[in-house]
Amino acid sequence: MPLLKIKALNNNTTLYVWKITESFDELFRSVALKDVSLARLEGMKAESHQKGFLSVRRLLMEAGYIDFDLHYDAFGKPHLADGKHISISHSHDFSVIVISQENIGADLELLKEKTLKLAPRFMDVTHLKGLSETDSLQKATVVWGIKESVFKIKNEVGISFKDHIFESDFNLNDKQCKVTLRFNNKEEYFHILFDFIEDYVFVCAFNSVSLSDV
């Protein structure tokens, strides 16, 4: 079944997961798109991106919305017409949306060896010490998703994943951790939830504490 999961992350935040098994035509016939969305869809070269785009619109329908309720600001951040926050992610055969009363950022990542090889570029690799190769890959992918999720909330030019976004050390079984963003002489704090969906990592960041001077 394409709609894989609906899960409450907290009292006012819901995750919707779609596993893409349909053809492009099946997905296209199942949604109504506004003109700007149709133009965006037609501009996508890869069918996988087109199917991801359409599956997100199916998830919107599951959440009680349609494509006409969704718009993007000048920075590419999605917004809903009713004022609720939304974050969107698509990776290969899966799409997710998270809808919340809170400011959130969500990311979905396929587990792949390349992420572990690149880990020194975006994280404190001492957090991988003593782990098996499998656990190291999972943890590095979670950390990448954490930093993507935080960036989706802030979306400010100049933020470096390695130099500005710092995750507390965590165990994979915890499925949560804390993150600090140190940028422009400010500190901001985030609460992170993560989970594993087949061969993917799902991460959601919540903006937990207001900005304060360092």
Spans of model-derived segments:
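Core catalytic alpha/beta fold that binds nucleotide/phospho-ligands
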Residues: 1-214
